[in-house]
């Protein structure tokens, strides 16, 4: 499974961009294209959608945005174009609407019917409630870690070993919970937890864990 492409954005249109990587150009449709600038080097998380007639690559600014896109298109009647339209309203805004069971506001998004909005909330409300909770916990842990580093600078005798140990345990628990929500099996999750290296960016931590699972021979079909 290819998770992202890294390259230079050489062209940008209303709803797609062209990413150059090792001499090849990739046409990628993205939500909220204003976040991407021409001539910048950028990591873009990708999803390749293929049917009997076409193969289209969609791109995202973060791995979490990619996950949300996949969840949306898993709903019958919601295609990639509708999912991209929904993401144009903002990823966190969309997550908050789902978590809050606000299908009425969700249904105001272009191309998204009331029936589909209700189904999205029904399927994913609990998941994104937990996503928000995990994000909140991770932010608190990051703030705590920053405070601890400041203490180290101000007082070389400060002993925060126990606090750091607790932080690692909480991060592992949040990572395990996130991988479960993504549909990975307990054996795969346990394997990733033993192999993944610490990373202050939780999204990068998720990405690295998925890479480990994807590259492990014992989990390949």
From Swiss-Prot:
Pfam families: HHH_5, RuvA_C, RuvA_N. Residues 133-155 are annotated as: Disordered. Residues 62-139 are annotated as: Domain II. GO terms for cellular component: cytoplasm; Holliday junction helicase complex; Holliday junction resolvase complex. InterPro entries: DNA_helicase_Holl-junc_RuvA_I, NA-bd_OB-fold, RuvA, RuvA_2-like, RuvA_C. Disulfide bonds: none annotated. Residues 146-155 have a biased composition (Basic and acidic residues). GO terms for biological process: DNA recombination; DNA repair. It is found in: Cytoplasm. This is Holliday junction branch migration complex subunit RuvA. It comes from Mesomycoplasma hyopneumoniae (strain J / ATCC 25934 / NCTC 10110) (Mycoplasma hyopneumoniae). The lineage of its organism: Bacteria, Bacillati, Mycoplasmatota, Mycoplasmoidales, Metamycoplasmataceae. The gene is ruvA.
């Amino acid at each position: 499974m290819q998770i992202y492409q890294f390259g230079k954005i050489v062209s940008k249109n209303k709803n797609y961009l062209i990413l150059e990587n090792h001499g090849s150009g990739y046409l990628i449709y993205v939500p909220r294209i204003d976040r991407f600038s021409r001539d910048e080097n950028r990591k873009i998380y990708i999803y390749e959608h293929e049917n009997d007639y076409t193969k289209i690559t969609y791109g995202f600014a973060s791995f979490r945005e990619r996950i949300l896109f996949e969840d949306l298109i898993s709903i019958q009647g919601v295609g990639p174009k509708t999912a991209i339209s929904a993401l144009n309203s903002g990823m966190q805004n969309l997550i908050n609407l789902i978590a809050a069971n606000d299908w009425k506001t969700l249904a105001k998004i272009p191309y998204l019917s009331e029936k589909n909005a209700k189904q999205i909330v029904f399927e994913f409300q609990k998941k994104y409630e937990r996503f928000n909770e995990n994000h909140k916990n991770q932010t608190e842990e990051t703030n705590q870690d920053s405070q601890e580093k400041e203490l180290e600078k101000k007082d070389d005798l400060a002993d925060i070993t126990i606090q750091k140990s607790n932080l690692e345990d909480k991060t592992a628990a949040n990572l395990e919970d996130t991988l479960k929500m993504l549909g990975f099996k307990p054996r795969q999750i346990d394997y990733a937890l033993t192999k993944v290296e610490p990373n202050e960016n939780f999204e990068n931590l998720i990405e690295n864990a998925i890479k480990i699972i994807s590259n492990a021979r014992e989990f390949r079909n």
